[in-house]
Structures are given as structure tokens and as C-alpha cells.
Amino acid sequence: MNIEILGKSFPMSMGLDAVKEITAKMGCTMEQMGDVMTAGTPEEQLANITVMAAAMARSAYRREKVRCVLWGEDCKLVEPPDADQMLCAFDLLDSKKLIEAVTETMQEANKTTVDVEPSKNAKSHA
């Protein structure tokens, strides 16, 4: 998932570093992160979601830096804005995009896939 900030697109990732940062800043567990998005006043909710978005954008940035080092690539990366900068960059009309980006990034992290190989799966004899 990407988030657009003032015309620039930044990838978002729910890496373990993002989980660690979000739970530490929000004082919640991994299971409670969804609840944090809906807790408090609308202003507090937007601030919390912005903190989460910034952590997810930083996670994707750090992941790409590691990938570049591992593959010996010279990557020209732009560091994403922090939460305070995001609050300045977004207005109320953008808040829906922000909420969707955070929600979709969390949902993508929870997706699991199952490979089905008919030759290796048990047959039902019901």
C-alpha cells in the first residue's frame, strides 16, 4: 500500500519495526492496534492514525534501505515525513485517504495464502 503526501507517493509496510514503534507509542498490544484507531475524540483518532501511518511509511523506507544494501544497489530514497509533518500535510478532506491507507496496510499484513497441490492434499471420503 502507498500513501500520497503532497503529490509524492510513499510505500507503507506493517513490518515488525512498525509494530514495535506503534505499540510503544500507543501503549497498546498488537491485537489492540485496531482499537487505537477508533479510541478517543475524532482529533485524537486522526493523530493516532497519523502516528501509525508514519511508522508504516518509515518501516517500508527502512526495508528498502536494507534491500538496497543486501543487493549492493545504489538506491536514491526519500525519507518519509514524520507524524507531525503528516499532520501539517493532510487536511480533513485527506483524512479518509489516510485512514484507508493505514487500514489496508494492516489488512495486507494479516493476509495469509494457502498453496493447494492436489497431489499432496488428502482426499475426502465422506
Where are these regions (language model features)?
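Charged interaction scaffolds used for protein-protein
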Residues: 1-4, 28-44, 61-126
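Short, isolated positions in well-ordered beta-strands
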Residues: 10-12
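Residue-level signal for threonine
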Residues: 15
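Short amphipathic alpha-helical "interface-anchor" segments enriched in bulky aromatics
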Residues: 22-27
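Short, hydrophobic/amphipathic alpha-helical patches that form generic packing surfaces
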Residues: 48-59, 104
